[in-house]
Curated annotation (Swiss-Prot):
Protein family according to the UniProt entry: Belongs to the class I-like SAM-binding methyltransferase superfamily. Protein arginine N-methyltransferase family.
Consequence of changing C431H: 8-fold increase in MMA production and almost complete elimination of sDMA production
CDD domains in UniProt: AdoMet_MTases (cd02440)
pH profile: Optimum pH is between 7.5 and 8.0.
All residue ranges annotated as the SAM-dependent MTase PRMT-type domain in the record: 137-466, 530-845
Protein name: Protein arginine N-methyltransferase 9
Temperature dependence: Optimum temperature is 37 degrees Celsius.
EC number from the UniProt entry: 2.1.1.320
Length: 845
């Protein structure tokens, strides 16, 4: 009996505590709901945190409301730049809901916007693992995967020849005594594992990318080498002895080279390695044990070049027309691509672009023989140091074939040791692209045998730079040679530095002080060169404006007459003076001359959405050259307070006659949120006004393409010489390959093109967001991919094809995880889904 009272009191106390807790939970829930009603999301969020900490059993009931509150509060914190508070809220939320894919995905989206791509990828990846059917998380993961694990990783790992030669060179070095190895820029760790398998005692590997470092850890562990390879999440320039590695190593292996050899910082890395991480190099004549000396694989490189004619490079880097759909381009506006303009800027920008020249649409024509640009010895510290400070070398190359000088194409031979080498030449079957230096700013690009192509080459800012490209004609060469000296040998040019110096820039036009340089992306230059695009838009806009004119004229004259009667003046103005203008808005991304073209079509008030000052100045100069009255062309962002609210009325009492939207990205994908933008745009149009394009049809076909397979995923262990890498890196494969040139893609068509999808911007009920399409197989083979492109209809008669030869758009392709054997005469059913501007295509079996 004596023991029953304390128990009773405890029970009573527990009951009172539970009742108090329940009341607090109930009040907090009411307060949270009230705060939500008045949009006080921060306080609502705090109340929900209290509720869930006191009553975890309510998680399921309040989950969706809690998510909504979290996301709205996070938006406010983001707008206020309270980043730490925002991240803190998500961490609290994930403690309560650790397996909630929606919260994981939202956290990833915020991190991605802040620039934390590695961390964002982790959350997207987790969200997909939690719910493989969560399409938003999948699309986010695919987008970030392209940033984090660039597609060349797959291509290089599938390059058996490259893997075999690197393995042989490393094996040879280790056998000769280089037993301690540092792998700089380890990637998946494949070179480190080659070294360990070859018998190296100590192997260290450094990788700066968090994603690639974690991937390498998994790969090394899967291959049971984690005990023998020490992985460091750092860049080699930050490695210290003995903090990271106990002592200097005898061998550095690296493949930190890009298409232009130096672009990934190999020179800087190796200077630091020779000074701080490697044993001293063996001097000539010494034959002692290699373990006492340092060496680098690759040992050296020879860089080669060739002057080429290539229409595809030309149309992406030079504006080759003087008139666009009736618009004159003045000579005082000089368009340049970033690859060329980087010569004169202080920014460290790659001074070249890259192309797989063996697959460039239309091919290329060699205008000179292949010539040697430079050699570099990676085992010579002094030579590496002198590269950045050395004066540019002047080179003169004889022309062997007449044609248009479009670019200097560059490749290299990587000499791994005295026996093993790799070439990145376009004639080799290799994973490598070539560096391309577009030629711009010449008075005349036509060259012929007898001419010489002059240039200066250097290694500034750790980039291979080819500058001051000019053409020396035969007649000019002879005149200068005579006045220079009587020495006949000078006519051969060869390596005569004095003659090269005297003749440099003879045909290089110098920029005039009044010129406006306008730097455009290569896709923007290709767009300017796309004549059918601009002529199509001009015709379509003209038709719409013509159809609106009678109505506008009637309305305006009616209003004018009423005003005259009420004022009793009896005076009249010309129709031209009384007509209200048509308002045209172009919100396509990047540089666009469509507003200027619209301005030529009568009483039009065109608005451009370009952001950059140099683009606005260029458009003003073009308008001026075409005799536009001042202030005809307006820049819309000057009238819009919030850039995110780009789509609004031109004036409070006016509507747009035409709105031009960007529906397709240059990559070949549908623009994000395009259907939402179209819905807003429809509400902003006057009666009879149009959105351009009015609708878009998506087309595709079945193909067999080994190339697409190899560019999308590592094809088993055979390619990586028995090492188990594929399952790990293939987690980062994406189902859609972008920036394709279908005209030059190595593939075998297995069907005719079929319509897959309709996106209707003017008539939304005609959209086909989910549909099944039957495709007739006209050739037997392995179905590996479904490339797709678009027909953009400005109206029923005017159509733009994104796969045409003049198109500035590239194409894209869905790549199947598992190829399907198909037989001629068979009929396949494709399931197409369009969700939030993302398209998925699956084969129903």
């Amino acid at each position: 009996m004596s023991n029953s009272r304390p128990r009773s009191r405890r029970d009573a106390g527990g009951g009172a505590g539970a009742a108090g807790r329940d009341e607090l939970v109930s009040r907090s829930l009411q307060s949270a709901e009230h705060c939500l009603g008045v949009q006080d999301f921060g306080t609502a969020y705090a109340h929900y945190l209290l509720v869930l900490s006191l009553a975890p059993e309510l998680k399921h009931d309040v989950k969706e409301t809690f998510q909504y509150t979290l996301f709205r509060w996070a938006e406010e914190l983001d707008a206020l730049s309270r980043i730490q508070d925002l991240l803190g809220c998500y961490e609290q939320a994930l403690e309560l809901f650790p397996d909630d894919e929606v919260i994981c995905n939202s956290m990833g989206e915020h991190l991605f916007r802040m620039g934390f791509r590695d961390e964002a990828a982790g959350y997207f990846h987790k969200a997909v693992k939690l719910n493989p059917d969560f399409s938003d998380a999948k699309e986010n993961f695919y987008r970030v995967a392209n940033w984090l694990v660039e597609r060349w990783h797959f291509i290089m790992l599938n390059d058996t020849k490259r893997n075999t030669i690197y393995n042989a060179a490393i094996q040879k070095a280790v056998c000769l005594g280089s037993k301690s190895v540092l792998d700089i820029g380890a990637g998946t760790g494949i070179l480190s594992m080659f070294a360990k398998k070859a018998g190296a005692h100590s192997v260290y590997a450094c990788e700066l990318s968090k994603t690639m470092y974690e991937l390498a850890c998994d790969v090394v562990a899967a291959n049971k080498m984690e005990a023998g390879i020490k992985l460091l999440h750092t860049k080699s320039l930050d490695i210290e002895i003995p903090k990271h590695i106990p002592e200097r190593v005898s061998l550095v292996v690296t493949e930190t080279v890009d298409a232009g050899l130096f672009g990934e910082g190999i020179v800087e890395s190796l200077i630091h390695a020779w000074e701080h991480l490697l044993l001293q190099p063996k001097t000539k004549g010494e034959s002692a044990n290699c373990e006492k000396y340092g060496k680098v694989i690759p040992a050296s490189a020879v860089i080669f070049g060739m002057a080429v004619e290539c229409a595809e490079i030309r149309r992406h880097h030079r504006v080759g027309i003087k008139d666009i759909a009736g618009i004159h381009l003045p000579t005082n506006v000089k368009f340049q691509s970033p690859a060329y303009s980087s010569v004169d800027t202080e920014e460290t920008i790659e001074p070249y672009t890259t192309e797989k020249m063996s697959r460039v649409p239309g091919g290329y024509l060699a205008l000179t023989e292949c010539f040697e640009i430079m050699t570099v010895d990676f085992n010579n510290l002094q030579e590496l140091k002198s590269l950045a400070t050395k004066k540019p070398d002047k080179i003169g190359i004889p022309v062997i074939k007449e044609g248009i000088l479009d670019a200097i194409m560059v490749w290299f031979v990587l000499q791994l040791d005295d026996e093993h080498s790799l070439s990145t030449s376009p004639s080799e079957e290799t994973c490598w692209e070539q560096a391309v230096y577009p030629v711009q700013d010449l008075a005349d690009y036509w060259i012929k045998p007898g001419d010489h192509v002059m240039m200066e080459v250097s290694c500034q800012d750790c980039y291979l730079r080819i500058q001051s490209i000019s053409v020396l004609g035969l007649e000019c060469e002879m005149d200068v040679a005579k006045s220079f000296t009587q020495n006949k040998d000078l006519l051969s040019l060869g390596n005569e530095a004095e003659l090269c110096s005297a003749l440099a820039n003879l045909q290089t036009s110098k920029p005039d002080a009044v010129e406006q340089t306008c730097i455009l992306e290569s896709t923007e230059i290709a767009l300017l060169n796309n004549i059918p695009y601009h002529e199509g838009f001009k015709m379509a806009m003209s038709k719409v404006l013509s159809s609106l004119t009678p109505e506008k004229l009637y309305q305006t004259m009616d209003t004018h007459c009423q005003n005259e009667m009420s004022s009793g003046t009896g005076q009249s103005n010309t129709v031209q003076n009384i007509l209200e203008p048509f308002y045209v808005l172009d919100v396509s991304e990047g540089f666009s001359v469509l507003p200027v073209i619209a301005g030529t079509l009568g009483q039009v008030k065109p608005y451009s959405s370009v952001e950059k000052d140099q683009h606005r100045i260029a458009l003003d100069l073009i308008s001026e050259a075409n005799h536009f009255p001042k202030e005809t062309l307006e820049f819309w962002l000057r009238h819009v307070e919030d850039e995110s609210a780009m789509l609004q009325r031109p004036k409070s009492d006016k509507l747009w006659s035409i709105i031009i939207l960007d529906v397709i990205e240059p990559s070949g994908l549908i623009q994000q949120e395009i259907m939402e933008k179209a819905a807003i745009s429809r509400c902003l149009l006057q009666s009879g006004g149009k959105i351009f394009p009015q609708y878009v049809l998506m087309f595709g076909l079945l193909v067999e393409s080994q190339t697409l397979l190899e560019e999308n995923a590592v094809q088993g262990t055979e390619r990586t010489l028995g090492l188990n890498i594929a399952p790990f890196i293939n987690q980062f494969q994406v189902p859609i390959r972008v920036f394709l040139d279908l005209s030059s893609l190595p593939c075998i068509p297995l069907s005719k093109p079929v319509e897959l999808l309709r996106l209707d911007l003017m008539t939304p009920y005609l959209n086909t967001s989910n549909r099944e399409v039957k495709v007739y197989v006209c050739k037997s083979g392995r179905l590996t991919a479904i490339p797709f492109w678009y027909h953009m209809y400005l109206d029923e008669e005017i159509r733009l094809d994104t796969s045409s030869e003049a198109s500035h758009w590239k194409q894209a392709a869905v790549v199947l995880d598992n190829p399907i054997q198909v037989e001629m005469g068979e009929e396949l059913v494709l399931s197409i889904q369009h969700h939030k501007s993302n398209v998925s295509i699956t084969v129903k079996q």
